[in-house]
Amino acid sequence: MPNVQVNGIGLNYEAVGSGPPLLFLACTIDDSATKWVDHMERYASDYRVIIPDVRGLAGNARVADAEPSDWVADTAALLDALDIASVPVVAETLGSRIAVRLAVDHPGKVSALVLNGLIARSNPEGDAWRRQMFMPGTANPENIEQMRLFQGDTWAEAAEFYVKMHEKESFRTYFDLPAIAGDVRAPTLITRGDIDDAAHPIEHSTAVHAGVAASWLSVHPNTSFNVMTNHPEEFWSLVGRFLSETA
């Protein structure tokens, strides 16, 4: 896996396919850049898809603490290191929060946004769910195995960092997407399924859609939050049409 030095740390990333660059952000505790290589090779090979691991997670060195803005600054610095001036960003869940903040803080770097199954804001219920699901001592064996697969033997350290990062007040404020949606200038496609759930509420997608002036909202019937993994051919076809029509 390639590694570049950004902001004083080494940042791992994958680069898949050929063609115009596209940045993909997922960035959760139960995945990594390597998880998405096969998917991108199969469904997004018309692009050169850049998939980073964020500071403190997956293939990167563990850190005891970081600021939420570090994840955005590191992503911007990665694009600079790869000599990518501006790029469409496809993101899901936590990655959507990083992507929107990147578009607001570094508008020249983001030519378009695609937000799949986004999480728009923090809430106490979500923080409690995350702590129950992923913290050592409460995570079930299936979740531990998933974290071990992508975070390695230091999964517990990564999980504690991930959960505590989400519980910071600075995280909640910085990544409050409805509060900053009006500052997004990039054309934006929001996708999700119509089956609601507490971790990825439909209301989060509609709130961001209402705030971003140049946005499309696509809701797939009889589908859970993640359209990309449930209907990959349809998702990437829609992404291609969106990027073509808004270029």
Predicted segment positions?
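Conserved alpha/beta-hydrolase "nucleophile elbow" surrounding the catalytic nucleophile
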Residues: 91-96
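Short beta-strand/loop motif that positions the catalytic acidic residue
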Residues: 184, 190-192
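Conserved alpha/beta-hydrolase "acid-adjacent" motif
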Residues: 197-204
